[in-house]
Amino acid sequence: LVRPPYSYSALIAMAIQSAPRRRLTLSQIYQYVAGNFPFYKRTKAGWQNSIRHNLSLNDCFKKVPRDENDPGKGNYWMLDPNCEKMFDNGNFRRKRRRRGE
């Protein structure tokens, strides 16, 4: 299987944007990625850690606490509205680096 041409940030954004309420738990993000990209279903090594790393360090992703009437584990993750246009029109492909950058 070939690795999809998307960054981890793009995979996370796709997952969040696919959700009816535009927010998902970490576990739901994993399920989306593995369910839509067989490469990640077969490859256990490290991709989940990379997803967590991106959620924590990328300012485009905001952690949102669960409502009191929403049982379960973990917070939700949402896309910062300022970052949504980065992924408009399904533009999730990796940006190619130009020579000299």
UniProtKB/Swiss-Prot annotation:
<protein>
    <recommendedName>
        <fullName>Forkhead box protein I2</fullName>
    </recommendedName>
</protein>
<dbReference type="GO" id="GO:0003700">
    <property type="term" value="F:DNA-binding transcription factor activity"/>
</dbReference>
<dbReference type="GO" id="GO:0000981">
    <property type="term" value="F:DNA-binding transcription factor activity, RNA polymerase II-specific"/>
</dbReference>
<dbReference type="GO" id="GO:0006357">
    <property type="term" value="P:regulation of transcription by RNA polymerase II"/>
</dbReference>
<keyword id="KW-0805">Transcription regulation</keyword>
<dbReference type="GO" id="GO:0000978">
    <property type="term" value="F:RNA polymerase II cis-regulatory region sequence-specific DNA binding"/>
</dbReference>
<keyword id="KW-0539">Nucleus</keyword>
<keyword id="KW-0238">DNA-binding</keyword>
<dbReference type="InterPro" id="IPR050211">
    <property type="entry name" value="FOX_domain-containing"/>
</dbReference>
<dbReference type="InterPro" id="IPR018122">
    <property type="entry name" value="TF_fork_head_CS_1"/>
</dbReference>
<dbReference type="GO" id="GO:0009653">
    <property type="term" value="P:anatomical structure morphogenesis"/>
</dbReference>
<keyword id="KW-0010">Activator</keyword>
<dbReference type="Pfam" id="PF00250">
    <property type="entry name" value="Forkhead"/>
</dbReference>
<dbReference type="GO" id="GO:0030154">
    <property type="term" value="P:cell differentiation"/>
</dbReference>
<dbReference type="InterPro" id="IPR001766">
    <property type="entry name" value="Fork_head_dom"/>
</dbReference>
<feature type="DNA-binding region" description="Fork-head">
    <location>
        <begin position="2"/>
        <end position="93"/>
    </location>
</feature>
<dbReference type="InterPro" id="IPR036390">
    <property type="entry name" value="WH_DNA-bd_sf"/>
</dbReference>
<comment type="function">
    <text>Possible transcriptional activator.</text>
</comment>
<dbReference type="GO" id="GO:0005634">
    <property type="term" value="C:nucleus"/>
</dbReference>
<dbReference type="InterPro" id="IPR036388">
    <property type="entry name" value="WH-like_DNA-bd_sf"/>
</dbReference>
<keyword id="KW-0804">Transcription</keyword>
<dbReference type="InterPro" id="IPR030456">
    <property type="entry name" value="TF_fork_head_CS_2"/>
</dbReference>
